[in-house]
Amino acid sequence: MGKRLISQRRGRGSSVYTCPSHKRRGEAKYRRFDELEKKGKVLGKIVDILHDPGRSAPVAKVEYETGEEGLLVVPEGVKVGDIIECGVSAEIKPGNILPLGAIPEGIPVFNIETVPGDGGKLVRAGGCYAHILTHDGERTYVKLPSGHIKALHSMCRATIGVVAGGGRKEKPFVKAGKKYHAMKAKAVKWPRVRGVAMNAVDHPFGGGRHQHTGKPTTVSRKKVPPGRKVGHISARRTGVRK
């Protein structure tokens, strides 16, 4: 009998595949959406900017005038000691947090809420930003980095600016070991080896005098055992469309 596939070992959840969440700085989200923000604004001071191994962008530790503390995804151009504003009457300035309905069209934003008060879900990776396209009553249309246009409630909050850390891809990894440790910080097993390059004991497509699958690559979704479910799973068609 052959060995278990990587997908089977990942499903068991050993330490290799378990996310090292104990190394994370914490959850980066907005403070609760209360009446102070809905009718005015709350001030906060950036007391530190931290590196988070689980993210592609740094996070800022913020102390609010209400006595609360929290982490926020940090934009380009802010520094320790800066004052940020959260609320409907906040100034249109990078780092400030406003409802989408209070942000003018064409302004770049990030860390966008999908439901008012959820803390921010969209556009959080380093160097990313979305654009406010138009306002239509209680709806605001936002163009995401993928090009998709999404309609959101106008009371969903967003941060003005561009996420910091956008130049991370300009520096090459150079060595395979650097890439390995970068992936390990995010619980991603790397490198990813092709099945035909493995031995027969490790994968159904492995083994042989030359690299070939040796069997059909399309398998049923329900009629194959777990160790054989590789390749095109229940595909309607394969190959180049003619």
From Swiss-Prot:
Disordered: annotated segments: 201-242
Protein keywords: Ribonucleoprotein, Ribosomal protein, RNA-binding, rRNA-binding
GO biological process, one term: cytoplasmic translation
GO MF entries: RNA binding; rRNA binding; structural constituent of ribosome
CC per GO annotation: cytosolic large ribosomal subunit
Disulphide bridges: none
Keyword Ribonucleoprotein in record: yes
Bias type Basic residues, positions: 220-242
Record flagged with keyword Acyltransferase: no
SUPFAM superfamilies: Nucleic acid-binding proteins, Translation proteins SH3-like domain
Gene3D superfamilies in the record: 2.30.30.30, Nucleic acid-binding proteins, Ribosomal protein L2, domain 3
Highest taxon in the source lineage: Archaea
PANTHER family per UniProt: LARGE RIBOSOMAL SUBUNIT PROTEIN UL2, RIBOSOMAL PROTEIN L2
Quaternary organization: Part of the 50S ribosomal subunit. Forms a bridge to the 30S subunit in the 70S ribosome.
Family in the record: Belongs to the universal ribosomal protein uL2 family.
Stated role: One of the primary rRNA binding proteins. Required for association of the 30S and 50S subunits to form the 70S ribosome, for tRNA binding and peptide bond formation. It has been suggested to have peptidyltransferase activity; this is somewhat controversial. Makes several contacts with the 16S rRNA in the 70S ribosome.
The name this protein goes by in its record: Large ribosomal subunit protein uL2
Name of the gene: rpl2
